[in-house]
Amino acid sequence: MAEITAAAVKALRERTGAGMMDCKKALNEANGEMEAAVDWLRAKGLAAAAKKSGRQAAEGLVGVMIDGTKGAVLEVNSETDFVAKNEKFQDFVKGVTALVLEHGSDIDTLSKAPHPAGGSVNDVLTANIATIGENQALRRAALLEVENGVVVPYIHNQVAPGVGKIGVLVALESEAPSDFLESLGKQIAMHVAAATPLALDEDSLDDAAVERERAIAQEKAAESGKPAEIVTRMVEGAVAKYRKENALLSQIFVVDGKTRVSDVVSKAAKETGKPITLKQFVRFQLGEGIEKQETDFAAEVAAAAGV
């Protein structure tokens, strides 16, 4: 059996909100596997569902930029939050976000693209690392485009114009007036930032994630002792709830707390007299899925001193 450390118990407790002894038992049951321990706690009703695995612990910035009917979003990571406040770093993120519009979202291609300052993006990044004195890295990028309509950007927790901690793009396909679409898109983008949808619609949700929810619901329902047909209904109800809560078009609009996003779009289309399609969205949260390595500062000092 794997050794269960205090750090692992602490990490599981922070992630799930479950009690310390429950977290220790879950890790024992899961042989030290964090994801399996989360599932065990949820199956026992001891932890709330987490839409995203892992803590958001990496630093840096997310940038967004629009050019006509195209929009780009980029995440650049750094070691500390101090770098995110550095104007040179902010300008770098903005500049490379603009290059996504031209060269696309593939990070390898982007790294080799020519930078306005001279050399490649990677050359400028390397120079910045030397100047600022801290490691930095391009993590991910996305590009949205529509033929007719708008791509609307939104930055949450803005650090400087166009860069912040959460970046969202919303693509609306329509021949409705652009100012009308931009207003609608801004509201939907703010919703996306707050509601963290995992997919545009229920059919687009990750099959493995849905089946994981089904397995957790099955185990939880089976422990209720109810007849098999009721257990089946409980499981299907839980899966349906998961789908509605995680698909953007099925979510309840955070602005009014009662209307589904799909109905918000339909109502807007009727208002303007032109069909409107919510084509796509992208949401980047800084450090999503990355855990920063925790270190013992005293041990680091001792190691550096050769103690």
From Swiss-Prot:
Domain of life: Bacteria
Localization (cell): Cytoplasm
Span list, region Involved in Mg(2+) ion dislocation from EF-Tu: 80-83
SUPFAM superfamilies (UniProt xref): Elongation factor Ts (EF-Ts), dimerisation domain, UBA-like
Keyword line: Cytoplasm, Elongation factor, Protein biosynthesis
Gene Ontology molecular function, alphabetical: translation elongation factor activity
Annotated Gene Ontology cellular component terms: cytoplasm
Keyword check for Translocase: no
UniProt KW Cytoplasm keyword: yes
Pfam families: EF_TS (PF00889)
Function: Associates with the EF-Tu.GDP complex and induces the exchange of GDP to GTP. It remains bound to the aminoacyl-tRNA.EF-Tu.GTP complex up to the GTP hydrolysis stage on the ribosome.
HAMAP family documented for this protein: EF_Ts
UniProt record similarity statement: Belongs to the EF-Ts family.
Name of the protein described by the UniProt record: Elongation factor Ts
